[in-house]
Structure formats: C-alpha cells, structure tokens
Amino acid sequence: MNATEASPDAPLLEVTDLVKHFPIKRGILIDREVDQVRAVDGVSFQVQRGETLGLVGESGSGKSTACRAVLQLIEPTSGSVKFEGREIAGLGQRQMRPLRREMQMIFQDPYASLNPRKRVGQIVGDPLKRQGVASGSELRRQVQELLVRVGLSSEHYNRFPHEFSGGQRQRIGIARALSLKPKLVICDEPVSALDVSIQAQIVNLLDDLQDEFGLAYLFVAHDIGVVRHISDRIAVMNEGKIVEQGSADEVCERPKDEYTKKLLAAVPIPDPRESRERVRGG
C-alpha cells in the first residue's frame, strides 16, 4: 500500500485542525489588515464510510464555512483534509476535478441552487456530461432513472425549476448530487428552507438513498432535532470550534457542553417537564 492509499478501516473523510480566517481590512488609500474573523478555528472530525455525521450549530457558528473548506470551494487558512487517505487541502481546481465525482454537495436553498434557465434534464445531467460519464440517449436514461429514484417523474426531464415546489426542487438537487455516484455527500442545511412536513419526507429520502447506495453524509443543520434523527454521530459547533462530539444518543441524552444544552432546549417538546430536564442536562 502506498502513502496515498487508505486502509479499508480508515475514515472516508478526516479533517484535522481545520482553520479558515477572513481578514478585516480598513484604510483610506491602502487597505491594511486590522483583525480577522475566525470563522473556523481548529476543527477536527472524521466521517466513516456509510455513516452520517451531523454538524450542528446556530447561524454564524462556522459549520457551512467548514464544509466549503472541506470541499476546497474556499481555500483553508491551515489544517489537513484527507479524503480516502489523500491530502486534498490546497489542491487546485484541476487537481480537485476527479475528486468531484466522489464528493458532492446538496445546497440549502432549493430556489437559488438551480439554474432557472436550464431544464431539469440539463441540471441533473450536467455533472455526467462534464465528467464524460454519459451523453446522448444514455445520459437521458440515467437522468430519468435518478428523477424517479428521488420521488419525481421521468416526465419532469424537460421542465424548468419554476414549475416545481420547494420540496420537489430539493429532490432535483439531490438527484444532481447523486448523478456521479459519490461516496460522500455534504448536505448543507438541506431542509431548513422547507415546511416541517416536507422536511420529514426529504430526511426519509436521504435515509433510503444512503441505505441503497452506501453513501456517507456530512449533514449540516441548526436544528439538533433533525440532526439527531438522521445522524449516527453529532459534532456541535459554536463560534468556529467544535465544543462537543459523540454518538447521536450520547450528545442528545447526556449533553456536556452548555451550548449543546441550549440547542436541545430549543427543540419543541410536547411535555414541558422533559424540556426542563434537558435544560438541566438530565
């Protein structure tokens, strides 16, 4: 085994001391750096093959920035990101291109993430075309199969995004993410813009797809109740740092950090006595 090959037991994704700082600049004639925003400040976590790691925190906690740094959509300030044992931090877009087949992303806003000028068939099929996986009638067949698999119809192939509801648009985004048969899917707040009833449908769909395709998820959300439902393990992020990490049951039933307890207390619970117990961490 060479240095770039990972053992079967190695994590699919291993993030160590990931840092992303944004400079604050001021000046009249010449900008100079006066401070930094520490959006991600020494974050470490692993995602195993076929599992879901939930990354939870309020808006501004740094979780989405961390995901973009993992995918090299923004350049990390420092730290290590290994995918299947290979260091990918600092790789250029050309070097990352083959890895895009293995690492895909589902975005938060199903309205903004789909090009309104393109038909659904183009949106879902573009990754297949760019990577040279399929073309012509074979491309159409694969896209239509994906649409059916995510709960849409093959007849939706020629429609435009504005003809769909928010939940249906997110299904289109999921189909696009799965088109290249990735090993890791980063789900960046994939249900936060949807109604509660639709959220449950999308989460259940993601569960089913994980079982069918052996996917690993990094599932990002601010609602720890949703995160607990889908995750094997949870990492809680606050002010750019991970403050608590463990199994989903351990983090939600026996939280140690005050910030985790705060997130749990915000989850709607029918019995107010249970809510008080959660606040106390009991």
Pin down the residues of each PLM region.
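Short catalytic/signature loops enriched in Gly
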Residues: N2-P11, I24-R32, Q36, S247-G282
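Conserved ABC transporter NBD signature motif
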Residues: G79-E87
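Conserved ABC ATPase signature
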Residues: F160-F164, Q168
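A short, proline-enriched helix->beta-strand linker immediately N-terminal to the Walker B motif
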Residues: S179-K183
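Conserved ABC ATPase "signature" region
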Residues: E87, E138-E155, L264-A265
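ABC ATPase NBD coupling module
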Residues: L29-V34, I88-Q104, R130, S137, ...
